[in-house]
Amino acid sequence: MLLLELKKTNQTLETIHFIGIGGVGMSGIAEILHNLGYKVQGSDLVENYNTKRLESYGIKIFLGHAEQNITNVSYVVISSAINPKNPEIKEALERKIPIIRRADMLAELMRLKCSVAVSGSHGKTTTTSLVACLFEAAGLCPTVINGGIINNKSTNAYLGSSNYLIAEADESDATFIHIPSTIAIITNIDPEHLDYYKDFETLIGAFRSFITNLPFYGFAVCCTDHKIVRKLVDDITERKIVTYGIDSEDAHIIAFNINTDIASSTFDVKISLPNVLGTTIIEKITIPTPGRHNILNSLAAIAVGIELDFGIKAIKNGFNNFKGVKRRFTKVAEYNKASIIDDYAHHPEEIKATLATAKNIANKQNGKVIAIFQPHRYSRMQYLFDDFMLCFADADILYITDIYAAGENPIEGITGQSLVDKITKHKHHDKANFLAELDDAVGVIIDNAASGDMIIMMGAGNISSFANELDRRLLSRGFSCHTVV
């Protein structure tokens, strides 16, 4: 960023163009650069929440990708999701415009800061948001670049006034190992992004580098409830690691006396830090979001807060100020006294965690769990097909749509229908159904919803838009529901 800082002082401000600026990771970096005073623009195929937000700040957005979009730009930023055949990439190469990977731009933003990088297969976005809340409660105003919309801020990125930067570190293409972090958090490690890594051991090796690349004065925070993370922690001796968990009796930070409902979780915490005599107990910590997995996410934030001496009051206040993250067990509506939940879960482990939370709540309300799942990417379904067959046990009624391609080509034999067929054949679920059209979910809700039920609409595709339009869709059929968000 030093070169860019010099060029920013020139009378002619050079332009940074983002291809795919509507993506959650790209939009966050674009917003930070804009707030730092750089001239930013970008393109995306369709308008969405992020493009509208950036436009409201005065950032120029092109809908569609075309060579003329980069006529007067000095730098082009891309993510690994952008096809190399994109016309703007081809034009940038032709004109020798520097092309910068998203992760490299993030690294430049982090290089001169004291940085917290949050990675792991699941829970990154919520953990990043929780860490940010604790920093703010401690009187530190961090810059934050997140992978989801933070409800407190109605954005996924914002510029702070302190020397701290908190960022979600995407592990999908191994670029996260090059991020210059001071503190590294690993929430869990599961088989994911194997289309890039090819095998699980290579993915685990990337997480090892994520820790060992820390400076000697930094530290890692790791969840040892997860057996792969525990083994990784046991194998690393050259960096300080603070561990946390619920089931791990030897973890440095442990949650116990846990109680959760539809809106919150309350628990106590035992802290036994390495090289520190004695044990500290923090009683009755409350986070305004349900689920065991979110308690684990909060323990990661507590570990950072304890290591940086935030104090118990700041930790509790920070959690009290947390308002959740968009699409993380978000209640969007009520129909016939049933709660309709929008959730980003798209990996088998995420699905299990989300449905376990829903089951716990439904049992307390004498209700049932109705899961409507939209698979995301043919490659993910192919690599994890057996895991997908086993992850819906906590759903009383299950509906699976066809696969949201996300730009991928179909793979023979890998469909939503084939998943339902295998689940039924192997008796993993006795009420698994295929939804040929997502719009058919309206009928599912009308026919099945009852008082106390939890209707969970899950996936990383367009099922979220569907969930947030349920009031209109129900009204078109002569029914009405209460919209929550």
Swiss-Prot record:
Q: What is its main location?
A: cytoplasm
GO molecular function annotation:
ATP binding; UDP-N-acetylmuramate-L-alanine ligase activity
Binding residues annotated for ATP, in chain numbering: G120, S121, H122, G123, K124, T125, T126
Pfam families noted in UniProt: Mur_ligase (PF01225), Mur_ligase_C (PF02875), Mur_ligase_M (PF08245)
- Entry's transmembrane regions: none
The name this protein goes by in its record: UDP-N-acetylmuramate--L-alanine ligase
Report the HAMAP family cross-referenced here.
Answer: MurC
Q: Name one GO cellular component term.
A: cytoplasm
Q: To which species is this protein native? A: Rickettsia massiliae (strain Mtu5)
Q: Which reaction does it catalyse?
A: UDP-N-acetyl-alpha-D-muramate + L-alanine + ATP = UDP-N-acetyl-alpha-D-muramoyl-L-alanine + ADP + phosphate + H(+)
**GO annotation terms (biological process):** cell division; cell wall organization; peptidoglycan biosynthetic process; regulation of cell shape
Chain's role: Cell wall formation.
Keyword Nucleotide-binding attached? yes
Q: Which UniProt keywords apply?
A: ATP-binding, Cell cycle, Cell division, Cell shape, Cell wall biogenesis/degradation, Cytoplasm, Ligase, Nucleotide-binding, Peptidoglycan synthesis
Pathway this chain belongs to: Cell wall biogenesis; peptidoglycan biosynthesis
Whether Metal-binding counts among this entry's keywords is no
Domain of life of the source: Bacteria
Its subcellular locations are:
Cytoplasm
What InterPro entries does UniProt report for this protein, alphabetically? Mur-like_cat_sf, Mur_ligase_C, Mur_ligase_C_dom_sf, Mur_ligase_cen, Mur_ligase_N, MurCDEF_pg_biosynth, UDP-N-AcMur_Ala_ligase_MurC
- Gene from which this protein is expressed: murC
